[in-house]
From Swiss-Prot:
GO terms for cellular component: cytosol; endoplasmic reticulum; membrane; perinuclear region of cytoplasm; proteasome core complex. Changing I90E: Abolishes interaction with FBXO7, but has no effect on homodimerization. Belongs to the proteasome inhibitor PI31 family. This is Proteasome inhibitor PI31 subunit. The lineage of its organism: Eukaryota, Metazoa, Chordata, Craniata, Vertebrata. Keywords: Acetylation, Cytoplasm, Endoplasmic reticulum, Methylation, Phosphoprotein, Proteasome. Residues 2-150 are annotated as: Important for homodimerization and interaction with FBXO7. The modification Phosphoserine is found at S153, S252. The gene is PSMF1. The modification Asymmetric dimethylarginine is found at R219. Transmembrane segments: none annotated.
Length: 271
């Protein structure tokens, strides 16, 4: 039990009861498992510092001891509470990260000789049993639960993105057009209006000009270069441009006769 006697000697002036001696032993056992004491109380304080010694004010309350510890690599932090209940002491340990809890109840008379608190060699009884109970009841359960929590949620690593995913300006590889299907137009498709606007580099399809006389069969297309009073000069309307004709439709079939199905009484001059 190397180190326990030195720790007891440093804390001897403050050890005045059985529970003080037991908390001193508990502190030593926690430190031997790679932890450092930080301070007292539930919350961090301005005077916190890593130390193997008991912090100042560790036994101000003989009924409730509250100590905080941190593992040597900073991966784990413990909150240890020791509660005195008549001749017993209840030990409760919380690991902050995983929120795992372990507790242990010890009979003070089984391990502490209250008549010889000033003599280290006579203060503790059944030291090996006490140490075994602390390790099996607190240290081991906390470590096992912490390791299990880390294994159940491992850190996932994703492979780096390829150049094609991260470079939006990358030029795609060139493929010969030997197997490309020749473009063709579908004169019977009644719902291809605007298709060429959506895919300007694809095969020639319907533009934004809708032929109201289209009934599923090829007909004479509306001349998009029609203007007033004559046709627009060649090249005024680029191929595939968004352009509405603003003049007569020229050679296309005429519109409906305004005298066809006239309204009743249209020729009555007295109406």
């Amino acid at each position: 039990m190397a180190g326990l006697e030195v720790l007891f000697a440093s804390a001897a002036p403050a050890i005045t009861c059985r529970q003080d001696a037991l908390v001193c032993f508990l502190h030593w056992e926690v430190v031997t498992h790679g932890y450092f004491g930080l301070g007292v109380g539930d919350q961090p304080g301005p005077n916190d510092k890593k130390s193997e010694l008991l912090p100042a004010g560790w036994n101000n309350n003989k009924d409730l001891y509250v100590l905080r510890y941190e593992y040597k690599d900073g991966s784990r932090k413990l909150l240890v509470k020791a509660i005195t209940v008549e001749s017993s002491m209840i030990l409760n340990v919380l690991e902050y990260g995983s929120q795992q809890v372990a507790d242990l109840t010890l009979n003070l008379d089984d391990y502490i000789d209250a008549e010889h608190l000033g003599d280290f060699h006579r203060t503790y009884k059944n030291s090996e049993e006490l140490r075994s109970r602390i390790v099996s009841g607190i240290i081991t359960p906390i470590h096992e639960q912490w390791e299990k929590a880390n294994v159940s949620s491992p850190h996932r690593e994703f492979p780096p993105a390829t150049a094609r995913e991260v470079d939006p300006l990358r030029i795609p590889p060139h493929h010969p057009h030997t197997s490309r299907q020749p473009p063709w137009c579908d004169p019977l498709g009644p719902f291809v209006v605007g298709g060429e606007d959506l895919d300007p580099f694809g095969p020639r399809r319907g533009g934004m000009i809708v032929d109201p006389l289209r009934s599923g069969f090829p007909r004479a297309l509306i001349d998009p270069s029609s203007g007033l009073p004559n046709r627009l000069p060649p090249g005024a309307v680029p191929p595939g441009a968004r352009f509405d004709p603003f003049g007569p439709i020229g050679t296309s079939p005429p519109g409906p006769n305004p005298d066809h199905l006239p309204p009743p009484g249209y020729d009555d001059m007295y109406l």
